[in-house]
Amino acid sequence: MSEYWLISAPGDKTCQQTWEALNQATKANNLSLNYKFPIPDLKVGTLDQLVGLSDDLGKLDTFVEGVTRKVAQYLGEVLEDQRDKLHENLTANNDDLPHYLTRFQWDMAKYPIKQSLRNIADIISKQVGQIDADLKVKSSAYNALKGNLQNLEKKQTGSLLTRNLADLVKKEHFILDSEYLTTLLVIVPKSMFNDWNANYEKITDMIVPRSTQLIHQDGDYGLFTVTLFKKVVDEFKLHARERKFVVREFAYNEADLVAGKNEITKLLTDKKKQFGPLVRWLKVNFSECFCAWIHVKALRVFVESVLRYGLPVNFQAALLVPSRRSARRLRDTLHALYAHLDHSAHHHANAQQDSVELAGLGFGQSEYYPYVFYKINIDMIEKAA
């Protein structure tokens, strides 16, 4: 299950009573699996600070989730033909995502609760902002390397009209170091092989008789050599084109051929060298982002609960995993359980279907319910596809 509901309701006499009432209400029809979602005693601050922070946390939530999904998506791209291993590489704090979420514990070392809520939000914003910036740099460099390699590899394949010819020809195919003669490479459609063999010597004067040789062919074309005097090369190219024979620009140079092969080898080596460290970086920083995202959710629950239920802080946060096809019934059950929290609830009993936004009551939420509610979708692969 990839969808989780993070809710909170005020403590009755104790938070444990609220927890037991929730379990009792959802247990009857196995509507959901419920887990306590522990949020530490954070610094409350003033009401004005909470209202301002509520809106900012909504934006931070969207930003951190976006970066988390970007990291997951790019990890899938980098894995290429190993993409089926993406799921096992997406972990949080060395745990799978559902287990981390259902056993959530606040990270006191990274986000000290002695800090104000605003400072904790700023710590997360800077942390994830840096990851986002680093991702842009790393992905840009790796994509450039991959793009250069793909371009070179494309030139090694494809049609004879466009592909690199260096690996198809040999030194003996060419007249080299002659003051008067040169060898051209000509692409001839397969259907015109006979025409070429019968007429290439007549395309211009000064063509060496019986100098043509078929050195390679693909499904559509053949690669022929022809030797002629340098002074008629331009004329030959013009008349060859009129007959649908294409002269490829090519100068045989041993050093250039070796350099070309070395470039591909170097790019392949560089890609392999970068692959491992990049995958490790993406895995580590996916974990960082995901954990930060869930801490933002915890902050939002805390702030919204204080704004809704008042002081002293007394609420029970819970993580619900709706059973398959029971979301509607679970929503109805929660509404019945908590409708008393909202004096105007009888005016919008169908809020769960209509996603009504009540100005001044939702504190940045697009859906309003009598209880604090945030949806968490941890399916990174679906949205990363």
From Swiss-Prot:
This is V-type proton ATPase subunit C. PANTHER family: V-TYPE PROTON ATPASE SUBUNIT C. Gene3D superfamilies: 3.30.70.100, subunit c (vma5p) of the yeast v-atpase, domain 2, Vacuolar atp synthase subunit c, domain 1. It comes from Manduca sexta (Tobacco hawkmoth). Subunit of the V1 complex of vacuolar(H+)-ATPase (V-ATPase), a multisubunit enzyme composed of a peripheral complex (V1) that hydrolyzes ATP and a membrane integral complex (V0) that translocates protons. V-ATPase is responsible for acidifying and maintaining the pH of intracellular compartments and in some cell types, is targeted to the plasma membrane, where it is responsible for acidifying the extracellular environment. Subunit C is necessary for the assembly of the catalytic sector of the enzyme and is likely to have a specific function in its catalytic activity. The lineage of its organism: Eukaryota, Metazoa, Ecdysozoa, Arthropoda, Hexapoda. GO terms for cellular component: lysosomal membrane; vacuolar proton-transporting V-type ATPase, V1 domain. Belongs to the V-ATPase C subunit family. V-ATPase is a heteromultimeric enzyme made up of two complexes: the ATP-hydrolytic V1 complex and the proton translocation V0 complex. The V1 complex consists of three catalytic AB heterodimers that form a heterohexamer, three peripheral stalks each consisting of EG heterodimers, one central rotor including subunits D and F, and the regulatory subunits C and H. The proton translocation complex V0 consists of the proton transport subunit a, a ring of proteolipid subunits c9c'', rotary subunit d, subunits e and f, and the accessory subunits VhaAC45 and ATP6AP2. Keywords: Hydrogen ion transport, Ion transport, Transport. The keyword rRNA processing does not apply. One of its GO terms (molecular function) is proton-transporting ATPase activity, rotational mechanism. InterPro entries: ATPase_V1-cplx_csu, Vac_ATP_synth_c_sf.
